[in-house]
Amino acid sequence: MKFYQDENFENIDFTTRHELAEFDNCSFSNCNFGKMNLTGYNFLECDFTTCDLSLATLTDTSFNQAIFKDCKLLGLRFDACNDFLFAVNFINCQLNFSSFFQRKMKNTNFKDCKLISVDFTEANLENSNFENTTLTDAIFDRTNLSKCNFTTAQNFHIHPEQNQIKAAHFAKDNLSGLLLSYGLKIS
């Protein structure tokens, strides 16, 4: 396995590289990993800015303290990633059609993101932040949302009896997302 530490990668198309690698404290700017097989890759304390990882294979991929900013992350199976020390944060990213099924990811930031049709079934998102995030058709089923911040989140549908929402924060203007399951008409 190739090892990279404290390196900056800019404007690189990684889809043309086929070597298994570990990246420690590296930054990636405007790089392409789209549709790439990242099975077994390790990303430790790495930053991704304006990168495309859409439809990449993430089987046993390690993301430890990874930060994604302005990235395109469509259709990713984060549920297939290595569980050990998994920790990610997202700022202004598109994560549509991705899956976090059964993923343990307390204290995760989803700031200014699009999470359309994302699967959070049975995930532990305790104390996570969904600031200014669009959650149209996102699936919350038996999800731990305790202490999460939804005050500026939009278009979510969370069934209070099927999810843990104790001490979660909601704005009075977006409470309708908690009541849709009951068939109420809110004006």
Label each PLM-derived region with a short phrase.
Residues M1-S187:
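Tandem repeat scaffolds
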